Amino acid sequence: MVIGGGDTGNDCVGTAVRQGARSVRQFEFLPAAPDARAASNPWPQWPNVKKTDYGQQEAIAAMGGEMRAWGVDTLEVLLDKKGAAAGLRVVDLDWSAGKPERIAGSEHEVPAQLVLIACGFTGPEHGVFDAVGVPVATAGRPLPVMAAEGSHLAARVDGVAADAAPVYVAGDARNGSSLVVNAMADALACAAEIADALEL
């Protein structure tokens, strides 16, 4: 089960298919875009049309039909007795008024053995960094954690003890929203920096 759309959601869907998933579904919070560009959406505006990228194309072919659903709000990830994902509790949304309204009586459960949350490009979670005294810039779009040039070691707010454990950041939290492959490469570089600091 992939929650979210865009390039990240498409990559999740395509990867799941290529790794042999027997069933793949994708839920999108937003309503489905039109199949054709509307007159109210002229060039040079970004075209608001339904996009079916490589991952969805592969999934549709493998699953024998459309595997996406739009206007779906995930309320809860359901767990089995061992704490593993067992499904989702979701509700359908009505966007006709220009904003999401939950449709009464539409709540239902969907089985799932793996849930991938493909909701990105929103910046780091501030609460995590607030808890360890690391400042996060908030001007404009969500920005990454402040770190020294060329380093993964995060800056600290005034008042944090000098001997406090260091905090390292990588991926979107350090560089801003980007591709998963960039975050993975940055995580490896961060791990090497930590290993060096610990003299491992």
Question: Where do the PLM segments sit?
Answer:
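Flexible loop/turn segments at secondary-structure boundaries
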Residues: 8-12, 32-36, 76-78, 95-98, ...
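Active-site lining segments that contact anionic ligands and/or coordinate catalytic metals
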Residues: 24, 65, 69, 85-87, ...
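A conserved FAD-binding loop/helix module that cradles the flavin
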Residues: 9-14, 19-20, 170-200
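Rossmann-like dinucleotide-binding cores of NAD(P)H-dependent redox enzymes
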Residues: 13-76
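FAD-site-proximal beta/loop scaffold in flavoenzymes
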Residues: 96-177
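Beta1/beta-strand and adjacent pyrophosphate-binding region of the FAD-binding site
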Residues: 1-6
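Conserved beta-strand-loop-beta-strand element in the redox core of flavoprotein oxidoreductases
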Residues: 78-108
